[in-house]
């Protein structure tokens, strides 16, 4: 775009004032004329419409009156003695004379032709039908088209002379004495070229001409041929009265016997007076426009003589300010408005000069480097701070290596800013320092005239960020090492716990003395307590790493309450503590949330309540709050006890990790101090809330609220196989391959399997298991995870992919991470058991195996 094209054409003040006058007066004058023209046009059109309606009604009335008169004569003639005698005597001469005398007495209401019929056919006609090309057979055919009533019928007949449009009616000829129908009298009016009818309509309707059309084809008209228009013009202009024309065409549809026909009467009237009035309106508007232009020109001349001189001095003052010749005072003007403008401009120029000085000071004394670049990447202006950093002492020393290297790195960003982008946080070094630059395009009248670049020294910040990233990576490495350590410790601790709990279960089944059973229970409870502490530590570690998974599904809350009661009622009875469970939920209601995490929350809270209540009562109250219109219900569980209670100033700390009320509490009651922390985090993950109330020595109450979805469920009866004894679960002895590297775990699992009449082969690692499977077939494979040589997951893949075996594989792992279970299932396992393996969990696994594989097989 050239500079010339950017400049707009300037106009003088007189021209602008003239335009203003025109713009003000023109709408007013034009508005008046347009409004006048509009209302006049509306009145004219209303008058035209009224004229059209009146003319149409008059023409239709004349047309109907004409045929009504013919109908009256026809009805009267049919009762004449001459016609009655003709039916008996057939005296045609008398009949012809009768009709001739009638036609001569009233020729204006005479039909074009007549004929009489009896029950055999036509017995007489006046012979006029042949003049219209209608022969005897056509005449006979017309009788079949008029079969009902005495009304007129519109009939079109194709003759040798072309189409003929007729109005035809009949009346019965009755024998006066008996009333018998002797025959019918027919009258026919031919509309084609019926000049007499058209003249009658023209004269009586007071119109210039009349045209009768059928299907937009002219049938008859009153045009004499000396008019300035033809029938074609009338047809072309009918119903096209959107603009006023010299001819006013009125269209009148013809109804015959209450039925719409294709006949229409077009009347023509002279409309010259209305057209003349319209032309006069246009001429008046044109005259007003010419007058307005003349006034504008005279006004312009007067303004130029009166105002231009004073305006010239004002323009001269503004030009001097634009040319930056220095600040000057305005000399004043005789015109008050111009003097005010000049004084205002003087104040404005003075303020602008002060702002320029302030900007120069800000630019020159700023501690941060500031530069102005052109769109082409040429340095336009630079402040002293930037000169110092870039080692530029004067404008010609821009080839210094420091500046050259800086410019090479900055140019790509300058190009982006030249396209209109605003760039922030661009790091470009100068020597050993790192500066963060902001680049912003300078826009003038929508076009980019330059780019301002501002920098900030962030060398110290960059170094601090490096140290922070290094510390973060070290912390992540430490957290990962701790997670790996906990995972390994989980496996190493769970393995001996598995042996302790497994042997305790086996011993309890093999002894009969009550004292020995109690001792074994102590051993088992101690192992389970150790396992609970380990689980708390592992769960807390997962929460810290964000690896705790929430998996929601529908389940029966009543089943959860039943399980909780079965576990803690015996414990409460042994302590002499009353356990009260109040479940207000309907037994047929399922709730939708994470069952495992809900169990963990409730078991932790009930376990704490039982643990810290030496005597008294532990109460659990559950109810479901439902709100109208809400998507979710709210499960409210309140767990209260009459235990030792908590000091009020310690309540806020109870959900912190490794916190108990006092150090002696841990020694007296045990625990990891993580239970409430895990509860708080699980409740938050389920979008719920947990509150605590307590008084020292009086007890504690925890209230858990969780949003859940609820629905009715159909309770299915428990499968009988879940209630049978181990030895009766399977109908035949099953062959099981146990893959386990730990002798203790293998011993316990083999002992459990023996109760189910299973034959167990023991493989100590994955490679040995592969050899067993090549030589033998098995009903079930129990697969450990951490095996020497070939791990459990890898062994499972080998069995599925290389050996192509579909033998059910039930994995046994001490790793509680969800990733491990998912990896086993992805490799081809059918079930995952967590160590330490309890007898009930193993029983459920065997029930699952029977239902999924043995029942399907049979």
Swiss-Prot record:
GO cellular component, one term: plasma membrane
Protein name as annotated: Autoinducer 2 sensor kinase/phosphatase LuxQ
Keywords: ATP-binding, Cell inner membrane, Cell membrane, Hydrolase, Kinase, Membrane, Nucleotide-binding, Phosphoprotein, Protein phosphatase, Transferase, Transmembrane, Transmembrane helix, Two-component regulatory system
EC number, UniProt record: 2.7.13.3, 3.1.3.-
Protein purpose: At low cell density, in absence of autoinducer has a kinase activity, and autophosphorylates on a histidine residue. The phosphoryl group is then transferred to an aspartate residue in the response regulator domain. The phosphoryl group is transferred to LuxU, and ultimately to LuxO. At high cell density, in the presence of autoinducer, the kinase activity is inactivated, and the response regulator domain has a phosphatase activity.
List of residues that carry 4-aspartylphosphate: 784
Signal peptide: none
């Amino acid at each position: 775009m050239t500079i010339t094209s950017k400049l707009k054409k300037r106009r003088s003040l007189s021209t602008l004032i003239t335009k203003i006058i025109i713009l003000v007066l023109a709408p007013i004058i034009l508005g008046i004329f347009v409004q006048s023209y509009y209302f006049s046009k509306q009145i004219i059109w209303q008058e035209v419409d009224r004229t059209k309606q009146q003319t149409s009604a008059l023409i239709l009335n004349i047309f109907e009156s004409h045929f009504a008169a013919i109908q009256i004569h026809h009805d009267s003639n049919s009762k004449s003695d001459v016609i009655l005698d003709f039916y008996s005597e057939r005296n045609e001469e008398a009949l012809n004379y009768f009709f001739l005398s009638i036609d001569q007495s009233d020729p204006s209401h005479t039909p074009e032709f007549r004929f009489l019929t009896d029950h055999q056919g036509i017995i007489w006609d006046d012979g006029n039908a042949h003049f219209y090309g209608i022969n005897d057979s056509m005449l006979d055919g017309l009788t079949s088209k008029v079969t009902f009533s005495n009304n007129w019928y519109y009939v079109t007949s194709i003759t040798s002379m072309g189409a003929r449009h007729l109005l035809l009616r009949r009346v019965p000829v009755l024998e006066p004495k008996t009333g018998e129908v002797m025959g019918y009298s027919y009258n026919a009016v031919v509309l084609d070229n019926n000049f007499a009818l058209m003249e009658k309509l023209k004269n009586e309707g007071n119109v210039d001409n009349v045209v009768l059309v059928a299907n937009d084809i002219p049938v008859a008209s009153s045009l004499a041929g000396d008019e300035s228009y033809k029938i074609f013009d009338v047809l072309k202009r009918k119903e096209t009265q959107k603009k006023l024309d010299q001819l006013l065409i009125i269209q009148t549809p013809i109804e015959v016997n209450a039925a719409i026909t294709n006949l229409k009467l077009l009347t023509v009237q002279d409309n010259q007076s209305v057209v003349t009035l319209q032309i006069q309106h246009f001429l008046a508007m044109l005259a007003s426009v010419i007058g307005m232009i003349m006034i504008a020109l005279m006004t312009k001349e007067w303004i130029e003589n009166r105002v231009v001189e004073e305006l010239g001095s004002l323009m001269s003052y503004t030009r001097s300010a634009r040319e930056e010749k220095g600040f000057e005072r305005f000399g004043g003007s005789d015109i008050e408005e111009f003097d005010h403008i000049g004084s205002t401009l003087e104040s404005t120029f003075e303020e602008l000069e002060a702002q320029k000085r302030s900007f120069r000071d800000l630019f020159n004394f700023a501690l941060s480097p500031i530069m102005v670049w052109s769109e082409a990447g040429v340095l336009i202006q630079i402040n002293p701070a930037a000169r110092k950093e870039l080692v530029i002492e004067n404008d010609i020393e821009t080839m210094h290596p420091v500046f050259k290297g800086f410019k090479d790195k900055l140019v790509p960003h300058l190009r982006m800013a030249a396209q209109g982008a605003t760039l922030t946080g661009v790091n470009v070094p100068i020597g050993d320092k790192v500066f963060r630059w902001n680049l912003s395009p300078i826009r003038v009248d929508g076009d980019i005239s330059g780019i301002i670049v501002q920098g900030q020294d962030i060398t110290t910040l960059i170094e601090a960020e490096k140290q922070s990233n290094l510390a973060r990576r070290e912390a992540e490495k430490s957290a990962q090492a701790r997670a790996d350590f906990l995972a390994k410790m989980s496996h190493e601790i769970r393995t001996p716990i598995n042996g302790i709990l497994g042997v305790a279960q086996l011993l309890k089944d093999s002894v009969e003395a009550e004292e020995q059973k109690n001792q074994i229970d102590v051993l088992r409870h101690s192992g389970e307590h150790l396992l609970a502490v380990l689980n708390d530590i592992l769960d807390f570690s997962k929460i810290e790493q964000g690896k705790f998974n929430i998996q929601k599904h529908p389940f029966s809350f009543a089943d959860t309450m039943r399980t909780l009661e079965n576990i803690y009622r015996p414990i409460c009875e042994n302590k002499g503590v009353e356990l009260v469970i109040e479940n207000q939920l309907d037994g047929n209601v399922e709730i939708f949330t994470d069952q495992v995490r809900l169990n963990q929350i409730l078991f932790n809270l009930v376990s704490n309540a039982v643990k810290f209540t030496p005597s008294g009562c532990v109460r659990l109250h559950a109810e479901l709050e439902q709100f109208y219109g809400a998507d979710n219900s709210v499960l409210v569980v309140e767990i209260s006890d009459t235990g030792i209670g908590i000091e009020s100033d310690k309540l806020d700390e109870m959900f912190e990790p490794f916190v108990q009320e006092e150090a002696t509490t841990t020694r007296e009651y045990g625990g990891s101090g993580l239970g409430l922390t895990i509860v708080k985090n699980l409740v938050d993950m389920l979008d719920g809330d947990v509150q605590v109330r307590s008084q020292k020595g009086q007890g504690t109450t925890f209230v858990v609220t969780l949003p859940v979805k609820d629905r009715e469920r159909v309770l299915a009866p428990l499968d009988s196989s879940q209630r049978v004894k181990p030895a009766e679960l399977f109908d035949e002895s099953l062959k099981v391959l146990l893959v386990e590297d730990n002798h203790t775990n293998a011993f316990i699992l083999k002992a459990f399997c023996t109760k189910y009449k299973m034959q167990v082969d023991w493989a100590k690692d994955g490679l040995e298991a592969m050899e067993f499977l090549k030589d033998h077939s098995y009903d079930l494979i129990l697969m450990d995870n951490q095996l020497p040589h070939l791990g459990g997951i890898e062994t499972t893949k080998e069995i599925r992919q290389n050996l192509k075996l579909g033998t059910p594989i039930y994995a046994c792992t001490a790793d509680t991470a969800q990733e491990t279970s998912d990896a086993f299932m992805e490799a081809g396992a059918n079930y995952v058991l967590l160590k330490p393996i309890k007898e009930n969990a193993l029983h459920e696994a065997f029930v699952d195996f029977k239902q999924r594989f043995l029942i399907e097989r049979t």
